[in-house]
């Protein structure tokens, strides 16, 4: 059963943070690449700490071993310096898919007793 094996590693490019540069009076979009470095098919979901300002597309999916997916990370216009951005980040959560499951994302994979791993990518805003 897939849930008894801990999910393997993923890699992200960039690896430690996402940087947006001023001005912030228009929407910005950057891209991150997520690579399934493991030997199993995994399901992933993306969370953000500020859903009004930050968006990710596609927000969830499934990918096979060694497969990579390109995600668009968007930052909507906001008043830089007047809003708290210290805790802004996106979190990649991933788990093994059940053996024999179709390559279609299912939210319940994250709600059972299987292990879910997380990687936080802080957002840095340059003035």
From Swiss-Prot:
Source taxon at top rank: Eukaryota
Record-linked SUPFAM superfamilies: PapD-like
PROSITE patterns reported in the protein's UniProt record: MSP
Keyword field: Acetylation, Cell projection, Cytoplasm, Cytoskeleton
GO biological process: oocyte maturation; positive regulation of smooth muscle contraction
Positions of modified residues (N-acetylalanine): 2
Keyword Cytoplasm set for record: yes
Expression tissues: Sperm.
Subcellular location: Cell projection, Pseudopodium; Cytoplasm, Cytoskeleton
Domain MSP: 9-126
Membrane-spanning intervals of the chain: none
Any single GO CC term annotated in Swiss-Prot or TrEMBL for this entry: cytoplasm
Misc. remarks from the entry: Around 30 MSP isoforms may exist in C.elegans.
Function: Central component in molecular interactions underlying sperm crawling. Forms an extensive filament system that extends from sperm villipoda, along the leading edge of the pseudopod.
Protein name (database record): Major sperm protein 38
């Amino acid at each position: 059963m897939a849930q008894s094996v801990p999910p393997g590693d993923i890699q992200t490019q960039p690896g430690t943070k996402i940087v947006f540069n001023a001005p912030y009076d228009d929407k910005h979009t950057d891209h991150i690449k997520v690579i399934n470095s493991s030997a199993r098919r995994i399901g992933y979901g993306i969370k953000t700490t500020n859903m009004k300002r930050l968006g990710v597309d596609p927000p969830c999916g499934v990918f096979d071993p060694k497969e990579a997916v390109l995600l668009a990370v968007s930052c909507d216009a906001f008043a830089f310096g007047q809003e708290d951005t210290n805790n802004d980040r996106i979190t990649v959560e991933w788990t093994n898919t059940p053996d024999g499951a179709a390559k279609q994302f299912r939210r319940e994979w994250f709600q059972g007793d299987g292990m879910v791993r997380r990687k936080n990518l802080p957002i840095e805003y340059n003035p």
